[in-house]
Regions:
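Bacterial N-terminal signal peptides that target proteins for export
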Residues: 1-9
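Aromatic-residue-lined binding/catalytic grooves and analogous aromatic/hydrophobic interfacial grooves
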Residues: 21-26, 168-186, 197-252
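Membrane-proximal, proline-rich intrinsically disordered regions
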Residues: 21-84, 88-91, 95, 99, ...
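Conserved, well-structured interaction surfaces
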Residues: 70-189
Length: 252
């Protein structure tokens, strides 16, 4: 009797095993219709702009001077800011901007990316914002890993570039962006200028002037050259109407 039960049990188990090995086409049952299959450059740009908008509005200085006070988390009020670092910029907006540039330059992805604006204009805006972030970072932390950065496991310890080299990289970044700007469609997802490339050109030139002023004591000759290049073009922000603004929500 026991042997019979064992044989029946083995037969049932074997049947289940062989049945489970059948190749069954379940169609799109396991495909998420809401899951994106590729990064969308317009969304990457919006997220990068949202993150960058807080760079110039850090509250630490107000807390240092006790114009405001903290309760539950009094770190800044106690000057406990030694742990501040640039990791969130590398893994946040800069990573998004790098991806925008990559998608608009890749032979297999640029056609799809162009649905969200002219390829070169998207690259130009990404480079301008990237230079803006980079200036903030080097002014705060000095030397930064840049030329060897973003290589992942191929180079987990990239070298640090000097602040002097970083500024030269930023000037090149802005000038490359200015050369790319054209009359084509501006980028979708641009919540700052709404894809208006003329305003991005004004901002890029004004950023170049700001960078020149920042190095005027360290390298007066270079600062003078870069500043005068913009002045001679006459193409820079000269009124509040062209200011770079990030609007949170609506005005209602």
């Amino acid at each position: 009797m026991n042997n019979t039960l064992k044989k029946i049990s083995l037969f049932i188990c074997a049947s289940l095993i062989f049945t489970s090995c059948d190749s069954v086409d379940f169609g799109d049952t396991n495909e998420n219709p809401n899951g994106p299959t590729a990064a969308v450059t317009s969304q990457l740009l919006t997220q990068a702009q949202k993150t960058v908008s807080s760079i110039g509005t850090n509250l630490s200085g107000i807390l240092f001077t006790q114009q405001l006070a903290e309760g539950q988390y009094p770190g800044e009020s106690r000057y406990a800011v030694l742990t501040y670092n640039y990791n969130s910029y590398f893994t946040g907006p800069i990573q998004n901007l790098n991806e925008i540039i990559k998608l608009n330059q890749g032979a297999e992805t640029m056609a799809q990316a162009e649905a969200f604006g002219n390829n070169n204009n998207q690259i130009a805006v990404a480079k301008i914002i990237r230079a803006y972030i980079l200036q903030f970072m080097t002014d705060r932390w000095g030397a930064l890993p840049w030329t060897e950065a973003f290589q992942g496991i191929d180079n987990p310890q990239p070298k640090f570039d000097s602040q002097q080299d970083i500024y030269m990289i930023m000037f090149a970044e802005v000038e490359e962006a200015l050369a790319l700007i054209n009359s084509g469609a501006g980028p979708s997802g641009d919540v700052i200028f709404g894809g208006d490339m003329a305003k991005w050109e004004l901002f890029a030139n004004s950023l170049k002037m700001t960078m020149a002023l920042r190095i005027s004591d360290a390298d007066p000759a270079l600062a003078k050259t870069k500043f005068e290049q913009v002045i001679s073009s006459g193409n820079f922000i000269s009124s509040n109407a062209d200011n770079i603004l990030f609007n949170y929500g609506s005005d209602d």
